[in-house]
Amino acid sequence: MLPKIFYLSLLPAALGHPHLQPRLDNGLARTPQMGWNTYNHYSCSPNETIVRSNAQALVDLGLASLGYRYVTTDCGWTVADRLSDGSLTWNETLFPKGFPALGKYLHDLDLLFGVYQDSGIKLCGSPPDNVGSLYHEDQDARTFASWEVDSLKYDNCYSDAATGYPNVNYEPSTSPQPRFANMSRALAAQNRSMVFQVCEWGIDFPARWAPALGHSWRIGNDIIPHWRAIYRTLNQAVPQTSFAGPGQWPDLDMLFVGNDILSIPEEQTHFSLWAILKSPLTIGAALKDDNTSINDESLQILKQEEVIGYNQDSLGVSASLRRRWTEEGYEVWSGPLSGGRTVAALINWKDEARELTLDLPDIGLQFAGTVKNIWDGTTAQNVKTSYTAKVQSHGTILLELQDTTASGQYPTDTFATSTDSSTTFESIYGVTTSFRYNITVKLSEASSSGDVNIQSTASNKTITAQVSASGTEASAQIPLLAGSSNSITIVSPQSVDAITITPPNGTYFPNTAFTTTGDADTVSCGAGYCQPVGSKIGNISTNGTARAVIPATAGTKYLAIDYINNDVAFDSAWDWGSNSRNLTVSVNGNKPVRIEVPLSGQHSELFGPGKGWWDTATIGVLTEGWKDGDNDVVIGNEGGESGFTSYGPDFVGLRVL
């Protein structure tokens, strides 16, 4: 199996290794919650007729039976003042029958009653003012329990006392954690279990504290009604997927499927990624009211049972980003499912339909007995090394892979043909061009002969491998080219059962081996951070680079780049903020390879060590132009002046495979 460095990964700091955090465990949300919410379509203007009509539609359209059961009335349901006894009440003009009656209506439909409140003095969407729960948590929790509420979405507006309770403050004077903790404790004291949805907009890296308080946490700012919001949200999800698990789910925000905002392929991408990242699936479209009905194509996306199954899978492990090809306009996410299955999503970011190929080793596999293409509705059998399919502009190839073999494993009966003493293996994958791949040949029975001959199409040389003392294996180093078109021929007096190939470890070059130019400079980090070096080069820009002379052999080389990015899009999320930074790698003056790296920070951007700028991640990129001997390698941000980010990520080091 390929080492972890081949994929995008996050390097744990010596302090606070990411893992499942202590979590609120009241038996709820063992899988991500599913339902419907008023906000994405009706904004802060809900009413009783709207909620009842859409709730009935959940049942009539077959959505409730698939798991969409939490029905939440978002902002705009209450009034400016509390009752004389200090308790919350509803807007009687909008909800003439009242909230308890609304809850009963939902329960009679076998649905669940969700309400919305705020950890500040007013609800988001004020004015007109709607009173919030700050300083009234215990009383409001009792009220919710008396109304037989099943879930609470708890927002973050008008909450920072030190700055006069502004509508929004993305840099509050203190962490929002204590305010959410107060409501969590108040809910826990009631004789009714309620799902608690922490909606803090990603402030203060809530993945580290929200699981102890609630069942889900918002990973970032609101989703906006634009296709670009999908990319921004996924970039923010990258450092948070490892925190997902039963009872603690990263909330990517409500769905825009069926809102007539996105194309059908875009909706498929949106729904696929939210599902496999284990986000709560909350419909934000108008399903049915006096003026609107959801279109059938979008409805069928929301009802896709296999995709829902990936979201609700009992294993409860989020997919993660495995590789990204920025200039080519695609990337792959994957994760494990119960029953030994794997789910993978290949996203086409380009504005054109085309064919894309998934190399299975990029998701840790070499072979799949069955590959189900969910949106295409096709199934392929006995897929070796690579899978190719057509995909629409902004669409996703969503795959379920079954009966798989780990990467680097090549059984003869699957990958090879034999004649006499010669066995030829096809579809051999190389992540990089190198002469240092390790091959182990497994023989069917013990051999008294001392040698096995190996020929790779990457070289015209025959390599002789000595059989081990047991007589059942022979090992050697062999060359492979980057890609999936390599072949290997084994000549042995004994038949060959299988071969195992592991890629080279490569050589690591820390940032301290690089010289800086222009504005770029070297910065020391706190003990145990900026792993594995302890320092980094910052201020990489169009006129600030990191440069090194690196000895290597000729060919196409895979680089595993250690970087840091905690440039979180808060205010800019409403515009073109993407949570990414632009990085370029140039080898020997050739055209640079460009990659947009996602966030890496796993600590608070406000109060954490290094404000999250000491947390390293690794991303891989394939580079050309290498020659035998010394190579001039430049890490920069070419194009930063042309609409990309002005500064690149901080650079920790790189490994050349």
Swiss-Prot record:
PANTHER family reported for this sequence: ALPHA-GALACTOSIDASE MEL1, ALPHA-GALACTOSIDASE/ALPHA-N-ACETYLGALACTOSAMINIDASE
GO biological process terms, semicolon-separated: polysaccharide catabolic process
Natural source organism: Aspergillus oryzae (strain ATCC 42149 / RIB 40)
Sites carrying sugar chains: N47, N91, N182, N191, N291, N438, N460, N505, N539, N543, N582
Name recorded for this polypeptide: Probable alpha-galactosidase D
Function as written in the Swiss-Prot or TrEMBL entry: Hydrolyzes a variety of simple alpha-D-galactoside as well as more complex molecules such as oligosaccharides and polysaccharides.
Stored Pfam families: Melibiase_2, Melibiase_C
Disulphide connectivity of cysteines: C124-C157
Keywords: Carbohydrate metabolism, Disulfide bond, Glycoprotein, Glycosidase, Hydrolase, Polysaccharide degradation, Secreted, Signal
Gene3D superfamilies according to UniProt: Aldolase class I (3.20.20.70), Galactose-binding domain-like (2.60.120.260), Golgi alpha-mannosidase II (2.60.40.1180)
UniProt gene name: aglD
